[in-house]
């Protein structure tokens, strides 16, 4: 019992010393995200859904891009994404595809609703590496029924 009490006291002191909200740039306000409009008549509970984004990156920026993508990985996983990965196209150098899976179409829409301003800042840093006039190509793949 004494050990538990000591642990609680030390935990309380630690929380006061190292607060999670000390980052002055941390902005957890929700960000407006445009929801994709499916061309298929899809039920919200249909899934799983594989989401992918295709980026065109200069080879000289590949290493820095992958470092930024680790922050994007945390955003996707925090939002409920699993099986996150980035692949490089061996037939078209400079094409990188980010991919992750969510349980259903509704889960992905909810993921977008939880997108914060901090998430948007990370996404903007990642997209700064993208070397095309259009935004990265997004694909939403659902398992056939």
How should these model regions be labeled?
Residues 1-14:
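Symmetry-related core transmembrane helices of the 12-TM Major Facilitator Superfamily/SLC fold
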Residues 15-26:
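Helix-loop junctions on the cytosolic side of multi-pass membrane transporters
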Residues 23, 74-84, 101-137:
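An amphipathic, aromatic/His-enriched active-site/gating alpha helix that lines ligand/cofactor pockets
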Residues 31-76:
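Non-transmembrane accessory domains of multi-pass membrane transporters/channels
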Residues 48-56, 85-114:
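Short, well-ordered beta-strand segments in beta-rich or mixed alpha/beta enzyme
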Residues 61-90, 94-100:
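Short, highly charged
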Residues 87-93, 129-130, 143-144:
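A short beta-turn/loop motif at secondary-structure boundaries
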Residues 137-145:
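Long, low-complexity, Ser/Thr/Gly/Pro-rich intrinsically disordered segments that act as flexible linkers
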């Amino acid at each position: 019992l004494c050990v538990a009490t000591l642990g609680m006291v030390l935990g309380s002191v630690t929380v006061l010393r190292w607060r999670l909200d000390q980052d002055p740039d941390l902005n957890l306000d929700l960000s407006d995200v445009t929801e994709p409009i499916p061309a298929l008549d899809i039920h919200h509970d249909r899934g799983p859904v594989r989401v992918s984004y295709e980026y065109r990156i200069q080879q000289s920026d590949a290493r820095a891009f992958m470092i930024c993508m680790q922050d994007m990985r945390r955003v996707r996983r925090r939002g409920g994404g699993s099986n996150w990965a980035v692949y490089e196209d061996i037939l078209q150098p400079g094409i990188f595809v980010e991919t992750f899976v969510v349980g259903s179409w509704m889960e992905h829409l909810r993921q977008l609703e939880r997108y914060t301003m901090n998430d948007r800042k990370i996404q903007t840093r990642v997209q700064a590496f993208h070397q095309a006039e259009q935004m990265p190509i997004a694909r939403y793949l659902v398992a056939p029924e």
